Amino acid sequence: RRSNKFNFLPNWLDKESNLFLEEVNHSKKSYYSFKRGALIFVDFGINIGSELSNRHWAVVLNKNDSPKSGNLTVLPISSKEKKFSVMIDEVIQQKSKRFLLPILDKIGFDYFSIIHYALTEITPFDLGSAEEIYQELLIQYGDVYNSESAKEIYDNGVGMEKVENTTKKLKDLVNHYQRFNKISYAKCDQIKTISKDRIIYINELDPCGKLKVNNDTLDRIDTKLKELYLKD
């Protein structure tokens, strides 16, 4: 029977080649420093036998990570519960909302600021079908509106383009994170050390690495790792 790994192998080899080139061209890099318990989205590549392959979330185990370190030790995460797995608190999609909702709020405020500034400081115009949305935003943001900051957001007419660009990035993130709406389990029998270059960010607004499991989850992971790897 043909393994479905062959379907993913060409794309992985292409990505791996680009990572090697990046390694040669940028030998000295400064990396993001991750906290213990951080959740990161990792491309584990295509591997042999029952070694984990493809893209999975993972829990960072390092206690003292550094921007100078290019590696992390992690536990991959799966939606399937196995013998040596530990359930993580809260689904990843729910964790992402604490970071994505403030972005949505900022988009709403910037959109209102641009429209209100144009209406009151430049020239009134008919909003048409957008009038109802504007009135809702006026109720929500009218008290915190500031004409000086609104002028900066308006940015000589290009502010709306920036808001639309941010909106698209947020939609991409929402579509990405809504896939991870199931209870997840840290695979304690698949502990791995990876390069930070394997971490995937959808765009610069992605909270990957900022999401975190709670201390109770980390304690249960510690207990399971001791059970698996340390002598009594």
Identify what each model region corresponds to.
Residues 1-14, 23-24, 32-35, 85-232:
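C-terminal terminal-subdomain/extension
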Residues 33-46:
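Short coil-to-beta transition motif at edge beta-strands of beta-rich domains
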Residues 45-51, 65:
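Short, charged beta-turn/beta-strand-edge "cap" motif at the junction between a beta-strand
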Residues 53-64:
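Short beta-strand-centered aromatic/proline hotspots
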Residues 56, 69-75:
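Short aromatic-glycine-enriched beta-strand elements
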Residues 63-69, 80-81, 193:
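Short, conserved beta-turn/loop elements at beta-strand boundaries and strand-helix junctions
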Residues 75-84:
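Enriched for short, Lys/Arg-rich terminal
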